[in-house]
Curated annotation (Swiss-Prot):
One of its GO terms (molecular function) is aminoacyl-tRNA deacylase activity. Keywords: Aminoacyl-tRNA synthetase, ATP-binding, Cytoplasm, Ligase, Nucleotide-binding, Protein biosynthesis. Consists of three domains: the N-terminal catalytic domain, the editing domain and the C-terminal anticodon-binding domain. This is Proline--tRNA ligase. InterPro entries: aa-tRNA-synt_IIb (IPR002314), aa-tRNA-synth_II (IPR006195), aa-tRNA-synth_II/BPL/LPL (IPR045864), Anticodon-bd (IPR004154), Anticodon-bd_dom_sf (IPR036621), Pro-tRNA-ligase_IIa (IPR002316), Pro-tRNA-synth_IIa_bac-type (IPR004500), Pro-tRNA-Synthase_IIa_type1 (IPR023717). The gene is proS. One of its GO terms (biological process) is prolyl-tRNA aminoacylation. The keyword Oxidoreductase does not apply. Belongs to the class-II aminoacyl-tRNA synthetase family. ProS type 1 subfamily.
Length: 567
């Protein structure tokens, strides 16, 4: 492609609301153009990136035996009502009515459409397993669209849905998709980790996120320094915490503890380590048609992980409870404990199960129990509630967990029966009995990947694309268009590189050399060949964008050098 015939409107001005490098450089480089809140046009460079990523995703999904389909972007609201998500999903789901007052949605995800596609048509276990995918436009009405392509309202996504007769088959497909995703992100040149994750609004029993490590990452992930264990903080686990500190010596005795409302005050009052105290966190749980006060209990030197807590009580949302709401529920703020607690729902962290010699509130102002055994509660009271921290012990190998920042680029789920049961989608098993499908779903943020690549690889001058996925593998810059020999050599090199199957940009614009170099640094293609005065001595300059490393190469050798680097 000749730059003189190309459209890449670069600018020095960053978007006013941009804070992340990907947002700044993709707009400044003319990859995308913002046309509204969270809405972007893809210009030629952006569309080239979108197509290249799509090609890799499609090739690997096809190789895994997944069948491509295309769902309508607009989905019937009736399908979402059948699944139960029409009202539950929240304002992110854009709902609208047609002229006949029928409900429709702009799809942020397509579980309902996928179930409707097979319901009544896939009728026998002999037709299973089945895995279908699409690469299509999605819409999510984000409350605060920001960060450019990382948090837009309209986006391109690859979403796949699998249907199975049994759990073993569902697990095999889940593992196949995990391996397929790893191939995709490896081909795209990304430094990523597959991490255990919360299933969120999609639902299901098990999920993994694929996180690209980046210092500007929006998610906190914990990775073991000794094995492959990694998890989002919302789902992270650890080996059970222990302590060598002496335990309090008492036998479920009630003590007067005036004004000891905090864990620190209680530990100081009894001169014990906070490890032996139990902390109460009181929240208001919001459900579809009601709300109530819920108490969560964790170890005194731990913190509550709110996503885990929300999953434990099945709430749509957890918010802080006011003092009046706490009192109205019959709870005593600062002195709340699980022993003898009644009238409210409560949950206890798994690590406290069976613990002895603990200190907790006595549900009476200015009183605590000492020497409590956390063993007399029903199993359903115990949930994973703790917020795992850096330095905690890996649950797999005993190594230490380290905190990293990551950006989610993919998510795979074992959905189970959630959607098929709700929507009445069944098949006949080997015994002729009707059973709901087991399902999996698998998503990749295709347009988001463009921004993620920039976040993972850039400097203060612009993008630094990896050769595995870039709009152009190299750029040839003619420093002086009046130099006929230079123009002739550059044009011949351009044609030879294209004949090798490379995507090359020939900068033949009538612009100052400084403008051309600034654009090269901003656009970030892996290599630039500068055809200038050195040509008189039989030399050209090769610049590697990553680090802006410069080297002089004989003009007769530049083709073979680039062939070695890029082919």
């Amino acid at each position: 492609m000749r730059f003189s015939k190309f459209y890449a409107p670069t600018t020095k001005e960053a978007p006013k609301d941009a804070s992340l490098p990907s947002h700044i450089f993709l707009v400044r480089g003319g990859f995308v153009e913002q046309i509204g809140s969270g809405l972007y046009n893809f210009l030629p460079l952006g569309k080239m990136m979108l197509d290249k990523i799509t090609k890799v995703v499609k090739e690997e999904m096809d190789a895994a035996g997944v069948l491509e389909v295309s769902f309508s972007v607009v989905t019937s609201g009736e399908l979402w009502k059948q699944s139960g998500r029409f009202n539950v999903f929240g304002k992110e789901l854009l709902r609208f009515k047609d002229r006949k007052e029928n409900d429709f949605v702009l799809s942020p995800t397509n579980e309902e459409a996928a179930v409707a596609l097979v319901r009544g048509k896939v009728t026998s276990y002999k037709q299973l397993p089945l895995n279908i995918y699409q690469i299509n436009t999605k819409f999510r009405d984000e409350a605060r669209p920001r960060f450019g392509l990382l948090r837009g309202r309209e986006f391109t996504m690859k979403d796949a849905y699998s249907f199975h007769a049994n759990e073993a088959d569902m697990k095999r497909e889940f593992d196949l998709m995990e391996a397929t995703y790893s191939k995709i992100f490896t081909r795209l040149g990304l430094n990523f980790r597959a991490v255990e994750a919360d299933s969120g609004a999609i639902g299901g029993s098990g999920s993994k996120e694929f996180m690209v490590l980046a210092k500007n990452g929006e998610d906190d992930i914990l990775c073991c320094d000794s094995c492959k264990y990694a998890a989002n903080v919302e789902a992270a686990k650890r080996a059970k915490k222990t302590s060598d500190a002496p335990a309090p010596q008492a036998d479920a005795t009630k003590f007067y503890t005036p004004d000891a409302k905090t864990i620190k005050a209680v530990a100081e009052f009894f001169k014990v380590d906070e490890f032996y105290t139990i902390k109460a966190v009181i929240k208001k749980a919001i459900y579809e048609d009601t709300q109530k006060i819920v108490a969560f209990f964790v170890r005194g030197n731990d913190e509550l992980q709110e996503t885990k807590a929300q999953n434990a009580c099945g709430a749509l949302e957890l918010v802080d409870a006011s003092e009046d709401e706490v009192a109205a529920a019959g709870l005593v703020a600062g002195f709340c404990g699980p022993v003898g607690l009644s009238g409210v729902d409560f949950y206890i962290d798994n690590e406290l199960k069976g613990q002895t010699q603990m200190i907790c509130g006595a549900n009476e102002k200015d009183y605590h129990f000492v020497g409590v055994s956390v063993s007399s509660f029903n199993d359903e009271r115990f949930k994973d509630l703790v917020s795992v921290q850096a330095g905690d012990i890996c649950p797999k190998c005993g190594g230490k967990l380290e905190l990293s920042k990551g950006i989610e680029v993919g998510h795979i789920f074992q959905l189970g029966y959630k959607y098929s049961s709700a929507m009445g989608a069944t098949f006949l098993d080997e015994n002729g009995k009707a059973r709901p499908f087991l399902m999996g779903c698998y998503g990749i943020g295709v347009s988001r990947l463009i921004a993620v690549m920039v976040e993972a690889s850039h400097d203060d001058r612009g993008c630094v694309w990896k050769k595995e996925c870039t709009p152009f593998e190299c750029e040839i810059v003619i420093s002086n268009l009046k130099d006929e020999a230079g123009v002739k050599f550059a044009t011949k090199l351009y044609e030879n590189l294209r004949n090798l199957g490379l995507c090359v940009l020939l900068d033949d614009r009538n612009e100052r050399f400084g403008v051309k170099m600034n654009d090269f640094e901003l656009l970030g293609f892996p290599y630039a060949i500068i055809v200038g005065k050195g040509l008189e001595n039989g030399e050209v300059e090769l610049i590697t964008r990553d680090g802006l490393v410069k080297e002089v190469v004989k003009k007769d050798e530049i083709l073979s050098v680039l062939k070695e680097k890029l082919c």
